[in-house]
């Protein structure tokens, strides 16, 4: 049992150091990329929704 005590101490020290240093290393990450600007697809989708509502209204009033 005495032979297993030395590697377990090394493992314990390694785990403790890792737990302490891991959050420090992650806190220095680079800032996130800025949000992308509109590429036109949202505008196209908005126009498509408006046209669908107009078509629905026309269909409702014709019948």
Swiss-Prot record:
Membrane topology designation: Lipid-anchor; GPI-anchor
Spell out the InterPro entries in the cross-references.
AGP16/20/22/41
Q: How is it modified after translation?
A: Contains 4-hydroxyproline; hydroxylated on Pro-32, Pro-34 and Pro-36. O-glycosylated on hydroxyprolines; noncontiguous hydroxylproline residues are glycosylated with arabinogalactan.
**One Pfam family, short name:** AGP
Swiss-Prot/TrEMBL keywords: Cell membrane, Glycoprotein, GPI-anchor, Hydroxylation, Lipoprotein, Membrane, Proteoglycan, Signal
Where is a lipid covalently linked (GPI-anchor amidated serine)? 38
Instruction: Name the residues of the propeptide.
Output: 39-63
Compartment(s) where it occurs, according to its Swiss-Prot or TrEMBL record: Cell membrane
Cellular component GO terms held in the UniProt record: plasma membrane; side of membrane
Provide the residues annotated with a glycan attachment (glycosylation): 32, 34, 36
4-hydroxyproline occurs at: 32, 34, 36
Question: Which segment of the chain is annotated as a signal peptide?
Answer: 1-27
Family to which the UniProt record says this protein belongs: Belongs to the AG-peptide AGP family.
Role description? Proteoglycan that seems to be implicated in diverse developmental roles such as differentiation, cell-cell recognition, embryogenesis and programmed cell death.
PANTHER family attached to this UniProt entry: ARABINOGALACTAN PROTEIN 20
What's the protein name?
A: Arabinogalactan protein 22
Originating species: Arabidopsis thaliana
- Lineage of the source organism? Eukaryota, Viridiplantae, Streptophyta, Embryophyta, Tracheophyta
Which gene carries the instructions for this protein? AGP22
């Amino acid at each position: 049992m005495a032979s297993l005590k030395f590697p377990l101490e090394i493992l314990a020290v390694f785990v403790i150091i890792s737990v302490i240093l891991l959050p420090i290393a992650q806190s220095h990450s680079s800032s996130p990329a800025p949000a992308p600007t509109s590429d036109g697809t949202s505008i196209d989708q908005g126009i498509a929704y408006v046209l669908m509502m107009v078509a629905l209204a026309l269909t409702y009033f014709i019948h």
